[in-house]
Amino acid sequence: MENKEYTPGQNRPGRRGGMRGPGMGRGPAEKASDFKGTWSNLISYCKSYLPVVIIALICAAGGTVLTLLGPDKLSEMTKEIGKGLVTGVDMDAVSKIGFTLIAFYVCGALLSFGQQWIMATVTQNISKKLRGDISGKINRLPMSYYSRSTTGDILSRVTNDVDTISQSMNQSIGNLVSAVTLFVGSLFMMFKTDVIMTITAIVATLIGFVLMTVIAKRSSRYFVRQQRCLGEINGHIEEIYTGHTVVKAYNGEAQAAAEFERMNNNLRESAFRAQCLAGLMPPIMTFIGNLGYVAVCVAGAVLTMKGTIGFEVIVAFMMYVRYFTQPLSQIAQAAQSLQSAAAASERVFEFLEAKEMDDESNKTKTLDNVKGDVSFEHVKFGYDEDRVIIHDFSAQAKAGQKIAIVGPTGAGKTTLVNLLMRFYEIQGGKICIDGIPTNQVKREMVHSQFCMVLQDTWLFEGTVRENLVYCTPNVSDERMKEACRAVGLDHFVRTLQNGYDTVLNDQVNLSQGQKQQLTIARAMIADKPMLILDEATSSVDTRTELQIQNAMDELMKNRTSFVIAHRLSTIKNADLILVLKDGDVIESGTHEELLAKKGFYADLYNSQFDQAS
């Protein structure tokens, strides 16, 4: 009988990784709902780095200013050479200007390098701080937060969003300051040099940018469609991959291939249009620059023939036009990058500002030498205020007893154990361990009294030894091997290439039963005063189940044990069976007593054998 009552957004643990489904990639059109507010939060978060960032921005602006002085000096050099064509070139003056020009460019390059180095250092430190704060936040959030959020979404905030913030701050801020300085500075220098040629360059540039804006607007919808199609095809691949056995069993390969072909064609079409239009941008930028050069040359030639300007002005303007058009595209790219950073920051700060569990530093009560008496007194709980799952639950478990919790799907069995562990806080009544209410003791102390064996096994990428002694210090090899022998795992582990030092990864093929045996051995090694078992033997064969059951019976001696059982045949020897329905205890007693009552438990028990027959 299946028993997994619903909790909002529940994710099943036990997998060492996952595929990226739809929506994992950020599309180019994503924006923050509050751009100014989000950047204000980000700046406030990074305030300790602001003095260094300001120095980096000054370096960026200084390097750009020195670059802007280059054309003016080049104009002077051209003028000196022009005058020397008749009377002889003054090499001292030309050399002096040349060395000054080289000094400007070298200093500009050093300032630009300094800006890049400072920003790279700062952004990596900020990323490290963000990841550290998120990691700490994960441990302070209540379980209810995770029941409302998907694992992929939380992982995306730790990895993708933090990386987006880092890249945007490293590249966009410095580039934006440099681009704005270059744009304003080149415009100022052009007006300072000649107004007519400046207006000519601006008009020529505007014509090209109008064309670029039209194409950008048309291409944006194809980029959005491309991201949507990419998400669909990723989701389809994930579904087919995870359900590959079922697809094979039902001969669904042709149908899956046809669906993939349709999605693949849609992606190809949208990506082709998006990339074609995007591919027009570089030649358009080249066209804008060339158009500016042509306009400046024509206007300069006319003005030179009239004697209004000299040839050196045209030379300077040729460089100023490049400086004028170049930052416009950089500003647009930086603005888009800042939008992406704001969107990522919004998600990160939404997580960091989520309501945490109550601070328990002032709680002084402790659980010492726990015997294992547990009492539930008129407990009330609901995942939402308007959806109460447990209404008025009361029960008493004596130290060393084996308590079985049974009931139909959604009765509240797993929820009850979560409340006992203080994964969730009760809304009424109290739960006591040895007479001490659990809400008067720190959560960590409550957790330290239990070891758990869940239906969904959890193993991490580490050695067999590390998985067995997880968070249990000073475990001897003999104690570890004794636990493995008790669950019938020792022989299998010794057949592995490196025995207990074998790293558990995708190359080590463990059956579900072996994974479960490993987690049971972990619980035996932990040696806590109380146990929680959630259908611990549901995924193993009959022989292994009997072996594990005998080991668990030995482990549960003199320990209070709570067993969530879906197969009632496995709990006949329980000291007390609590029958839950709609969050309330409707029957309690031993197996024989409940069968004799011929009530709800008897119906559940008999229905399993009726289905088996």
What feature does the model see in each segment?
Residues 1-36:
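Membrane-proximal cytosolic tails and large cytosolic loops of membrane proteins
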Residues 2-4, 360-361, 367-613:
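ABC-type nucleotide-binding domain
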Residues 19, 40-43, 51-76, 97, ...:
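Alpha-helical segments in transporter systems
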Residues 28, 38, 46, 119, ...:
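Juxtamembrane loop-to-helix connectors within ABC transporter transmembrane domains
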Residues 43, 143-144, 160-169, 173, ...:
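An intracellular "coupling" helix at the cytosolic face of ABC transporter transmembrane type-1 domains
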Residues 53-111, 191-196, 307-311:
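Transmembrane helix-loop-helix hairpins at lipid-water interfaces of multipass membrane proteins
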Residues 84-85, 90-92, 189-203, 273-346, ...:
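Helix-loop-helix
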